[in-house]
From Swiss-Prot:
It is a peripheral membrane protein. It comes from Rattus norvegicus. InterPro entries: NTF2-like_dom_sf (IPR032710), Tim44 (IPR017303), Tim44-like (IPR039544), Tim44-like_dom (IPR007379). The modification Phosphothreonine is found at residue 129. This is Mitochondrial import inner membrane translocase subunit TIM44. The keyword Protein transport applies.
């Protein structure tokens, strides 16, 4: 009966169950729709209960089969689409319109090839004909004469060119031509320097030097003149008296201040006509300024010549542009106090050194640089009680940058160019008899504008 029951579908392990003495609670077949069955050992030692259902939930194999069927169906649709596309392409390939277009293209291509070959052949025939004609002409008397005439003309032209070249060399060696050439070069150089404002690209001195160091090499070659106190009528004095007298003059003289205010506007103009007019007015002033009246500038220059007969205004301005200004200005923007102290009078040095000393006390570093120095000019002169003072104006392009100990920008802008207009008062040091080291900075003033380009 147990075997029959097993064959009925409700137990699949008859040997194991019967051998272990498991008692079947029911001999009825388990329903297919879902129920529960129990298996118990005699004595109630083991009871196993299992519930199952065969609802709408699909098994793993059933889902896998469904996916395979869907993929096959999609592959079948794709194959049908590819087949239809190939059929359409084949119909297009075999269409009359496409066949006709191909025939026309082949016809045009063959015609083009034949035309090119015909043109090439005609050009070859024409070239041969022209060559034969030229050979015949060259063999005739007329052709020989034409050829000889061309050769003669070429020889004549060559001889003429050689004659002109030799004549130019002879002209270039004449004294008159040399004088004219030198004059033209001088005028050109003068115009360039006056209009453009400088003679070359600015270069920082290899080493900032003091006045005595700068004059050392020239001192051996130059004659030093002693001061004639009887002719001058003055006695050597200290820096403080010089500076105090200059300050009184500068602060109380309205004409002086108005003059420099107008000159700043005039010199700062970038208009080409104004720059050209500056050059013209400067030259006319130099030539005619001292002919009709005894100006204060002439008195100052005369007084300087009494002490230094070799003094020349143009040479002095060149010295300012290439030596005096670069050394002092580089020392100012880089914080070189020793250089400043040697070039400046005491009051001016104290004024400049104060801000530098404060910056160094904070550990700040100077990274400024000078790009250009131009338009160096002798604006005016002033006779002080102790000696002559020359006021020099010039323009400088600077990049002002100060960094903290971490290397960060503390003040200034490394990408901003400043155009500075300086007014310097230079005094001849009465205690220094060497003319190349006699000038010191008595006072300084400046105005700045941002350079756009």
């Amino acid at each position: 009966m147990a075997a029959a029951a097993l064959r009925g579908g409700w137990c699949r392990c008859p040997r194991r169950c019967l051998g272990s003495g498991i008692q079947f609670l029911s001999s009825h077949n388990l329903p297919r729709g879902g129920s529960s069955y129990q298996i118990s050992r005699p004595g109630g030692e083991l009871t196993l209960t299992k519930s199952y259902s065969s609802g709408s939930r699909k098994g793993f194999l059933s889902g896998l089969l469904d996916n395979i069927k869907q993929e096959l169906a999609q592959n079948k649709e794709m194959k049908e689409s590819i087949k239809k596309f190939r059929d359409e392409a084949k119909k297009l390939e075999e269409s009359d319109a496409l066949q006709e277009a191909r025939r026309k293209y082949k016809t045009i291509e063959s015609e083009t090839v034949r035309t090119s070959e015909a043109i090439k052949k005609k050009l070859g025939e024409l070239t041969g004909t022209v060559k034969e004609s030229l050979d015949e002409v060259s063999k005739s008397d007329l052709g020989r004469k034409i050829k000889e005439g061309v050769e003669e003309a070429a020889r004549t032209a060559k001889q003429s060119a050689e004659s002109v070249s030799k004549g130019g060399e002879k002209l270039g060696k004449t004294a008159a031509f040399k004088a004219i050439s030198q004059g033209v070069e001088s005028v050109k150089k003068e115009i360039d320097e006056s209009v453009l404002g400088h003679t070359g690209t600015y270069r920082r001195p290899e080493r900032l030097r003091k006045r005595t160091e700068f004059a050392g090499a020239k001192f051996k070659e130059s004659k030093v003149f002693e001061a004639n106190e009887e002719a001058l009528g003055v006695v050597l004095h200290k820096d403080s008296k010089w500076y105090q007298q200059w300050k009184d003059f500068k602060d109380n003289n309205v004409v002086f201040n108005r003059f420099f205010e107008m000159k700043m506007k005039y010199d700062e103009s970038d208009n080409v006509l104004i720059r050209a007019s500056r050059a013209l007015t400067d030259k006319v002033t130099d030539l005619l300024g001292g002919l009709f009246s005894k100006t204060e500038m002439s008195e100052v220059l005369t007084e300087i010549l009494r002490v230094d007969p070799t003094f020349d205004k143009d040479r002095f301005l060149h010295q300012c542009e290439t030596d005096i200004i670069p050394n002092i200005l580089e020392a100012m923007i880089s914080g070189e106090l020793d250089i400043l102290k040697d070039w400046c009078y005491e009051a001016t040095y104290n004024q400049l050194a104060h801000s530098i000393q404060q910056a160094k006390a904070l550990g700040l570093q100077f990274h400024s640089r000078i790009l250009d120095i131009s338009n160096v000019d002798l604006a005016m002169g002033k006779m002080m009680e102790q000696g002559p003072v020359l006021i020099v104006t010039f323009q400088a392009q600077l990049v002002m940058v100060i960094k903290n100990p971490k290397g960060e920008v503390f003040d200034g802008d490394p990408d901003k160019v400043l155009r500075m207009l300086y007014v310097w008062a230079l005094c001849r040091d009465q205690e220094e008899l060497n003319p190349y080291a006699a000038w010191r900075l008595l006072d300084i003033s400046a105005s700045s504008t941002e350079q756009i380009l």
